[in-house]
């Protein structure tokens, strides 16, 4: 994978901090304090969206939305326009989920397309990964990205954390995590998140049907 677009200056904090929420679905998160993942209904209907001043957003196709091909295609086709928005500073959450969504082969195709857009626009990637870390590791080795890939909501064991860190991933920790994995993650590769709001899972599940 090669960069074909001059990366803009990223608005995300270069150095992780305890008071920055790296991944939330709370549309009312305070400006400059969080990376807000926009829901699928907003991505499909941009005319309903008004960006709040100073708020940073991420956009992507969630794995749970991949088992409806028409919906997945509609969301992916809208990504380029969203990625050109000056307040969209990351791609995601996107990724692979072995328990929900389309077949992993199909999910991998969708994810690869999004990773290409992230590389083109010079944007970091927020990854949702469930029982598919081997495939994500293979993708990173194959694509050699120039932008950060962060596994959000990481709950894995220390051995998996070490494997991901050695491969160049960053890790984001939420309310539930393995303390040993957290401790061994260097601060410069460690993010913190809330993954709020309460209805986020219901939204993704509804749009994946």
Q: Language-model segments: what does each one mean?
A:
Residues 1-209:
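Mid-domain alpha/beta scaffold segments of enzyme catalytic cores
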């Amino acid at each position: 994978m090669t960069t074909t677009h001059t990366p803009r200056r990223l608005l995300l904090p270069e150095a992780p901090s305890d008071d920055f929420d790296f991944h939330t679905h709370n549309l009312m998160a305070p400006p400059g304090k969080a990376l807000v993942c926009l829901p699928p209904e907003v991505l499909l209907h941009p005319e309903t969206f008004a960006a709040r001043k100073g708020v940073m957003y991420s956009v992507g196709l969630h794995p749970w939305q991949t088992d409806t091909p028409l919906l997945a295609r509609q969301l992916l086709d809208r990504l380029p326009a969203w990625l050109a928005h000056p307040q969209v500073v990351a791609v995601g959450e996107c990724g692979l989920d072995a328990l929900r969504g389309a077949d992993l082969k199909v999910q991998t195709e969708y994810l690869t397309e999004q990773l290409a857009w992230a590389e083109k626009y010079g944007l970091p990637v927020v990854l949702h990964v469930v029982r598919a870390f081997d495939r994500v590791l293979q993708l990173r080795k194959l694509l050699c990205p120039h932008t950060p890939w962060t596994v959000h909501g990481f709950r894995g064991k220390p051995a998996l954390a070490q494997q991901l860190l050695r491969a160049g991933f960053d890790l984001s920790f939420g309310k539930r995590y393995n303390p040993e994995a957290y401790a061994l993650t260097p601060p410069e590769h460690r993010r913190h998140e809330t993954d709020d709001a309460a209805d986020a899972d219901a939204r993704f599940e509804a749009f994946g049907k």
